[in-house]
A protein has these predicted regions:
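Amphipathic alpha-helical dimerization/coiled-coil segments
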Residues: 82-105
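Residues that scaffold the ATP/ADP-binding catalytic core of kinase and kinase-like folds
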Residues: 17, 80-81
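N-terminal helix-turn-helix DNA-binding core of bacterial DNA-binding proteins
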Residues: 2-44
Length: 105
């Protein structure tokens, strides 16, 4: 995909995945990579920002002698996801109108 993906779309994708199950960072990056070209060095700042905004929380769980940090969506995160979905629908509708030549004023 050659289109630049906005931070809001990446945040929404992360939050949407976390509505299904909790993920640790690497697994979450792997899931997002299935759709968007993203590196761990891009993902972790997004996760920190989402946590700072209280849109997700974290907990540690032992795995093979090490701790994995898992991310979990919060109620505020669900609200933010709904806002992102609404913004996306508005953008999609406007973009579709332009691309299909239906942008009447």
């Amino acid at each position: 995909m050659a289109i630049q993906v906005s931070t809001e779309i990446l945040e929404g994708s992360v939050l949407a995945l976390l509505t299904k199950e909790d993920y640790y960072g690497y697994a979450l990056t792997r899931e997002v990579k299935k759709v968007f070209p993203i590196s761990e060095s891009t993902m972790y700042p997004i996760l920190r920002r989402l946590k700072k905004e209280a849109w997700l929380s974290t907990y540690d769980q032992a795995y093979e002698g090490r701790n994995r940090r898992y991310y979990k969506i919060t109620d505020q995160g669900l609200e933010r996801l709904n806002q992102i979905k609404s913004n996306w629908q508005e953008l999609k509708t406007a973009t579709d109108a332009i691309l299909e030549g239906n942008n009447e004023e």
